[in-house]
Amino acid sequence: MRYPQFYDMYRDAIKNTWTVDEIDFSTDLNDLDSKITPAERHLVNRLVAFFATGDSIVANNLVLNLYQHINAPEARMYLSRQLYEEALHVQFYLTLLDNYIPDMAEREAAFAAVENIPSIKQKADFCFKYMSSLNGVDELNTKDERRQFLMNLICFATCIEGLFFFAAFAYV
C-alpha cells in the first residue's frame, strides 16, 4: 500500500456511517412552524437549498475530476467513501426540503436559487470555473496540468468545503 494514510481515512470514515432515515424531523417541523420568524424561516430555506446544490457540485467534481487523476487504490477507496458522504448529504438536504417546504412551487424556487440569487450563483460559478479548468486534462504530465489539478483541489477543499459551507453552517 503506497498511501496508508488514505486507507486509515477510509476506515475512519466507515466508522462514521449514518443514514437519513435515522433522523426525526418532527421536532424541526414544529419549531419551524412555531419558534422562528418568517425571516428566519426564509434563511433556513435558502441555506438548505444552497447546501443541496453545493454538495451536488462537490460530488460532481469528485467524479469528474479527482477520481480520474488519483489512481492509488487506497486513495480511490477514500474518494469513493467521500462520494458516498456527499450523496448522503444531498439526500439529507433533499429530505429537509421535502419536509420544510411542502409547497412544490416554493421548493422549485429554492432550487432555482443557484441561478437566481446572485450570491449563490457567484459561489456556483466559482465552483464551475475550477471544475471546468480540468476539462480535457487526461493526464497530469505538465507543470501547468498539475497546477490546474492542485488549484481544483484547493478550491474545493478549502474555499468550498472550508469557507462557503462553514460560513453557511454558522447561521445554523
Short names for language-model regions:
Residues 1-172:
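Non-heme di-metal
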